[in-house]
Amino acid sequence: MNRLSGFTLVEMLITVAVVATLLTIGIPSFRYVTNSNRIAAEINGLLGDMQFARSEAIKEGQPVTVCVSAGGAACDNTNTWQSGWIVFSDVNGNAAVDAGDVILRIQKPFSSTDTFVATNAVGAVTFNREGYANGIANGTLIALHDSTNTHNWTRCLSINLVGMMQSLTYGTVNGVTCN
């Protein structure tokens, strides 16, 4: 007996309906995951560079600065960290790239439209040879908001005077408010 193989119209319609249902359920969840991962990568990038700067300052016994820099060669006079930043050995500790200072890392501007703004107009953080953060108010926050500016995605980087840092989600944690 010669039987033809293939799908019937009913089987095909059921398959299409199942796939459409799964996509309808899955796409919003996927968007949530991609937004969450993008925000986490952005905040962790700055946190990692701040921790690197602090450890380099302690290791080398001289100040190391992290500052906003769109061009990657000098510090900008702004507190909008989404435009990029640099980490450099700051021999005289003046939070400016001078002769003799060595740029250790460069972070390019965000490709997203997320905003990353520091409280107290902090555009540079200098860690001294003991690892303390100079030039900031205690509890300085650098807040990261996604382009929709919803609280679901808000993350903050908290830095205190002794150089301790923590990444926070929206709300109040250990007396520090991230909003």
Where are these regions (language model features)?
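N-terminal leader/signal peptides at the extreme start of proteins
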Residues: M1-L9
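N-terminal helix-rich module
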Residues: N2, T21, I25-A41, G45-Q51, ...
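Residues within membrane-spanning alpha-helices of integral membrane proteins
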Residues: A17-V18
